[in-house]
Each structure stands twice: as structure tokens, then as C-alpha cells.
Regions:
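Gram-negative outer-membrane beta-barrel domains
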Residues: 1-325, 340-533
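A charged helix-plus-loop insertion that forms the helical arch/lid used to bind
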Residues: 331-337
């Protein structure tokens, strides 16, 4: 007599690894009073690390504890300590390089013989955060700088889904929120004018929070790691109404379209130091920040799978935006100027293309690594110009919305990442991608149209890094047709020693200036796709 297959038990120890990425913010308090602008540094982050844990299962409920640690790559800058247009404010830089956490988990096993675990988690977390507080250009006065590098305990909560692939291996997709209060760190003395005065060194309080998506792979102790499939186990606990949705062993192509509702950001840090100089390029004379760039794009995507586990995938999209703001900050004489302008005629295009290999795959899952390329281009016109910081520096009157400038940006980057797909139930599928961008190349052009002579800045940068994270939950209406909802976060940045070169007739012979560039775009999309087996 053939016995029915046993329900999977999650009890026992495990060890594994993970990659992840997402969005962070570090906030700086202002010891000089309420800030006109800034004080929050966006810190996109990519992380990779490992975890070890233990589960106890009682009926369908699963309880567990887990320790994890990650190394992180992150970068972000913004204005801080901008209490007045008569005080030289600072350029604040922040970025974590290590995360660790100890959490408890509670979840419920459902689906095919208990192979799918949905869980909540919470506990303590630790980060190491480091950065600088650098006075911007002080008009010839000695430049001051303060550095910080600290560890801090905080808290984390999260949720996730873990799928048992074989008796030895499981893959998880997880969202974590982390929050850290911060210490007080030193700020350098700065200059006020008028009346001229040296404001003494002070302190600023820091706090940080992060939204992180992860893909993890766990090995469960006591099982044969080379067992590729479950022994004689049906995919679903009851007979499905139709043919089950599962991955074919032969050639397969899935393609479709998406609508992506997203928000974008672009930042240009313009150093006060000539390219090639020995001074700190973090000392700024100007910064332009384009933010709130809300847009809608249409997109085509596809994935081709071979019988040998090799796959090709990619997407291409085109979008527009007609809202957003640009803050143009300058330091020198006067000490601080900040104008705000609108955005119109916004356009963005993008594509990604990857080749990879599924090193774990079965009838209802695939997990693989990939290498590829990504491209992103954005253009917009800037309208209006209203001064918000210093009454000694005026711009246009409120309501005068003439076009005063434009910006074009083009990004290319190498992608290296992990892709995971698993059928949670008969018709629900979860798909995720996490990619690290180890190298970026940036080219842009800025047009200033409000000056007596129109000026053009040719912008270049490379090195740096980036992160791209995506997740989709799909429902198969038929065996081949599905609808889905997903989320996506993209960020790229260059090294501080990129440059910008004024190329108009009014600045012939001017040297290249150090510059740093960064971008973000994130949002939610809806998709429809069809699979050909």
C-alpha cells in the first residue's frame, strides 16, 4: 500500500545567504534653528550577507528566531544646517556599511503540504553609519569639516514568504523596515554674514530609517542538499480545477506589458573645487535637486527560458511627467541662496537586458543569477524661479512661469543580481529581482536660460554604484495568461570626482569642476502577461 506523502515540517535549524536593496534616509537636526530646506539625506542601499536560525512548528504555526548580518553599499548627500540665507550651510553625507539584527518570527504554513510559510518578524537591529558634515563654499574663509563613524542599536519589523523548494533548500522574499535613533555628532564652525561672525562648532542629532527588500536562500540542517525534488509529492494539496500552473522543462517565453506609476529624483552636486585639485570635492558652490517628478510610463517586458536553465530577460519603457520641483542652491556671496522652480515637458526612457542561469529549478520554482545592462534617460524643462532663502538675492516674481532652464541625463550601468520565482499556490506566483550596479556611467547637459548669456554645462561621471529592486505578485487567470501588481526601486550615483564643464561663449577657458550626480525612481506597476510553452 502506497502511503500518502508527509506534510512538510519547518522545525529545525537552517543557515543561508541573502541579497537585498532599497531606500533609506538619515535625518540631521539643526542646532541653529528651523531649516529652510534639506536636513534629510536619501541613502539608497544594496546589501549582501547571511543568516542563521531555528524554527519550531506546532500544527500549521511556525515560530522561530534568526540572526543575520549584512555588508552594505550606500551613498547620499544633501544640504543640512540651513537655518538662514545669511549663514553658510553644510553638505551632509551619510551611508551605512554594516547591518545586523536578531529577530523573532511567527508564521503560518499553507499551500501544497505546508511548503509555503508566510511570516511576520520583529526584533533588534544594529547599523554602522558613517559620513561627513562639510561646510560649503565660504568665500575664501578656511573650510571646516567634521567626520562621523558610529554604531547604533535600533529596531526592525518585517514580513515575508518562504517557499520550501526541496527537503534541503528554501527561498524567501522579505521586506524589512529598520529604524535607528542616532547620537549627537559634531558640526564644524561656520560663517555668518551679515553681520559677520564665526558661529562656533555645535552638535547635530542623527536618526535613520530604511525600507529593504531581500531575496534569501536557506539550507535546512539534516537534509540531503543534492536532493533536487520532493519524493512522490503532489504539487497541490487538492486536485486543481484545471491543469496546474507549473514551469515547463522545455523552451518557454513569457511577455507582456506594464503601466508604471512612479516618482523620480535627480541631484547634481557642483563642487567649488576645480577638477584635479587637492581640496575636498564635497565642498559645494552649487547644488541642483530635481524632485517630486511624478510620471506614468508604458513598458514591454519578456523572459525566454531554455531547457538547460539559461534564460534571457529584459524590458523597455517610455514615460512622461508634467510636475515636480527644482531647488537651485548656491553658496558664496551671499552665504546661501535657494530658488525653487517648477518642472514641465518631462520625458524618460529606460531598458534593462539580462542573461542568467537558474542554479535551482523545479516544477514550481526557479532561482538564478544574472548579469546585464541598464539604461535610463530623463529630460525636462524648468519653469519659474522664486527665492526662498535670502532676500538679498532675487529671481522672478511668483507666477512668472517662463522656461528658465532644462536638464538632460543619460545613465548606463552594469547589473549583477539574483532572480527568484515561485508558485505559492495553484495560481499565485511571486517573482523578485535584486540587482547591484557595480559601475555606472553618466552623461548630461544642463541649460541655464535666465542669464544674460545662455550657459551650457556638459556633465560627465562614472564609477559609483547603484541598486535596482523589483517584486511582482501575479495571478494566473488561465494556464498561460496572468495579471500582476508589483513595485520597483531604482537608484544610481557617480563618484564625487565626476566633472562638469561650462561650454558656452561666456565661459570659454573655464576649467572642469568636480561634480557628483545621483538619481532615483520608484513606484508601483500593473502588468498583464502571456506565456508560451
Amino acid at each position: 500500500v502506497k502511503l500518502p506523502p508527509a506534510v512538510w515540517d519547518w522545525s529545525g535549524g537552517y543557515i543561508g545567504g541573502h541579497v537585498g536593496g532599497g531606500y533609506g534616509r538619515t535625518s540631521f537636526s539643526n542646532p541653529y534653528g528651523p531649516s529652510i530646506y534639506g536636513n534629510v539625506v536619501d541613502t539608497p542601499v544594496f546589501l549582501a550577507g547571511g543568516q542563521i536560525g531555528y524554527n519550531w512548528q506546532k500544527n500549521g504555526w511556525v515560530f522561530g528566531v534568526e540572526l543575520d548580518a549584512s555588508g552594505a553599499v550606500s551613498d547620499g548627500t544633501n544640504t543640512c544646517l540651513a537655518a538662514s540665507g545669511f549663514v553658510v550651510s553644510a553638505n551632509c553625507k551619510a551611508g551605512p556599511n554594516i547591518f545586523a539584527s536578531g529577530t523573532g518570527r511567527i508564521g503560518y504554513a499553507f499551500g501544497a503540504l505546508g511548503h509555503t510559510l508566510a511570516y511576520l518578524k520583529g526584533g533588534v537591529a544594529w547599523q554602522n553609519n558613517r559620513g561627513d558634515v562639510v561646510n560649503n563654499f565660504e568665500g575664501g574663509s578656511p573650510q571646516e569639516k567634521a567626520h562621523f563613524d558610529y554604531g547604533r542599536l535600533g529596531a526592525t519589523i518585517g514580513l515575508g514568504v518562504e517557499q520550501a523548494l526541496t527537503p534541503a533548500w528554501s527561498v524567501k522574499v522579505e521586506y524589512d523596515y529598520l529604524h535607528f535613533g542616532g547620537p549627537s555628532v559634531a558640526t564644524p564652525p561656520t560663517v555668518q554674514n551679515p553681520p559677520f561672525a564665526i558661529l562656533p562648532a555645535n552638535t547635530t542629532g542623527l536618526s535613520s530609517n530604511y525600507h529593504i527588500g531581500k531575496i534569501g536562500l536557506n539550507y535546512h540542517f539534516g537534509a540531503d542538499p543534492w536532493t533536487a525534488q520532493w519524493s512522490d509529492a503532489p504539487l497541490y494539496a487538492k486536485a486543481p480545477a484545471g491543469a496546474p500552473i507549473a514551469y515547463t522543462a522545455g523552451w518557454s517565453f513569457e511577455g507582456g506589458s506594464r503601466l508604471w506609476l512612479s516618482r523620480g529624483r535627480f541631484q547634481w552636486d557642483h563642487s567649488a573645487v576645480d577638477a584635479g585639485g587637492l581640496e575636498d570635492p564635497s565642498i559645494l558652490i552649487s547644488r541642483l535637486t530635481y524632485h517630486g517628478l511624478d510620471g506614468l510610463s508604458g513598458e514591454l517586458f519578456g523572459r525566454l527560458d531554455s531547457p538547460w536553465g539559461v534564460f534571457l530577460k529584459g524590458n523597455i519603457g517610455l514615460g512622461r511627467f508634467h510636475k515636480g520641483n527644482m531647488n537651485d542652491e548656491d553658496w558664496g556671496l551671499p552665504p546661501y541662496v535657494n530658488t525653487i522652480s517648477g518642472q514641465t515637458n518631462g520625458r524618460f526612457t529606460y531598458y534593462t537586458t539580462d542573461a542568467g542561469y537558474d542554479f535551482l529549478r523545479g516544477a514550481n520554482y526557479k532561482l538564478g543569477g544574472f548579469i546585464g545592462w541598464t539604461y535610463y534617460e530623463q529630460s525636462s524643462d524648468t519653469t519659474g524661479c522664486v527665492q526662498i532663502a535670502n532676500p538679498m538675492a532675487t529671481c522672478l516674481s511668483p507666477g512668472d512661469d517662463r522656461v528658465v532652464g532644462s536638464q538632460n541625463t543619460q545613465w548606463n550601468a552594469l547589473r549583477v543580481g539574483l532572480s527568484a520565482e515561485t508558485m505559492l499556490t495553484e495560481r499565485w506566483r511571486l517573482s523578485t529581482d535584486v540587482a547591484y550596479l557595480p559601475w555606472t556611467d553618466f552623461k548630461g547637459r544642463d541649460n541655464h536660460l535666465l542669464r544674460e548669456e545662455t550657459t551650457f554645462d556638459e556633465q560627465r561621471g562614472n564609477g559609483g554604484g547603484g541598486v535596482q529592486v523589483e517584486g511582482v505578485l501575479s495571478y494566473f487567470i488561465t494556464k498561460n495568461f496572468s495579471l500582476g501588481i508589483g513595485g520597483r526601486y531604482w537608484a544610481m550615483w557617480t563618484k564625487r570626482r565626476g566633472d562638469s564643464l561650462c561650454s558656452s561663449s561666456g565661459c570659454i577657458g573655464a576649467p572642469p569642476i568636480f561634480a557628483k550626480y545621483s538619481m532615483e525612481r520608484w513606484g508601483t506597476f500593473l502588468q498583464a502577461s502571456y506565456r508560451f510553452d
